[in-house]
Amino acid sequence: MRKRIILVTTLLCILGCAHDNRGPAARLESTPRHDEWVTIDSEGRTLNAYVVYPQSSRKAGAVLVIHENRGLTDWVRTVADRLAERGYIAIAPDLLSGAAPNGGRTSDFPSSDAAREAISKLPREQVMTDLANAAKYVRTLPSANGKLAVAGFCWGGGRTFDFANAGDDISASFVFYGTGPHDDAGASGIDGPVYGFYGGADERVNATIDTTRAAMEKNGKHYDPEIYPGAGHAFMRLAEEPDPSEANRKAHDEAWSRWLTLLHAID
């Protein structure tokens, strides 16, 4: 059994850790998988979401990908595409839908700073409603098997904790350098295990890990944080930019390997 686990982990790393030097837009343009933009009715709002399907002969589990505070960028869409490459239906909702100038979405903001400012003003209830409707959409697709995992990056990591706490029968949650709950109210309703991925040089976020661990343990929840030495905040994205630091690149590869292994275990 141990040899089998090691073999699966090694294979998944080979599949998930290969570096593509092309930019996100070029990678998306050449994907062989079916991807599409969809609009979802979210309590009277129009929620835009990016969906990618695996090339598979069986029903697949789904992963809800929650973007950073920059909004639904091309990089986040490449994460969804990579998950589909590994056999999952991935949905990445644009939580800035309707918030850009003229009611646009992330791509309609003049700068990433403008997107960050808009994200800071999003009502929490609206974000949770949008996530719930995106989850409902992907779960009820004919090619979905009903299982759902959630993953979020930075701001999206914090929202991953929030959404898991809303209790929506989530198989597992994956938090990439996002802050977590500090009390019973933020942890008591969490569904499924939560796995954390943190850069060792990201003390602003890491200083909250012990408090989150205590809140999770008090409420009988599974929380497994992993810290990658020397890596900074947003290492998953920064490792794919030109000339990444060795620490970020190593953390990126190890985190992808761990993530895919954990997803494989619940599929």
Q: Residue locations for each model-derived region?
A:
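Acidic catalytic loop of the alpha/beta-hydrolase fold
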Residues: 201-206
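Serine-hydrolase catalytic machinery in alpha/beta-hydrolase-like enzymes
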Residues: 24, 28-31, 37-140, 237-240
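Short, proline-enriched alpha-helix->beta-strand connector loops that line the catalytic pocket
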Residues: 189-194, 219-222
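C-terminal catalytic histidine-bearing segment of alpha/beta-hydrolase fold enzymes
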Residues: 217-267
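Primarily recognizes the serine-hydrolase "nucleophile elbow" in alpha/beta-hydrolase
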Residues: 131-191
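Bacterial signal peptide processing site
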Residues: 18-20
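Short beta-strand/loop motif that positions the catalytic acidic residue
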Residues: 196-198
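C-terminal motif of bacterial Sec signal peptides marking the signal peptidase cleavage site
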Residues: 13-16
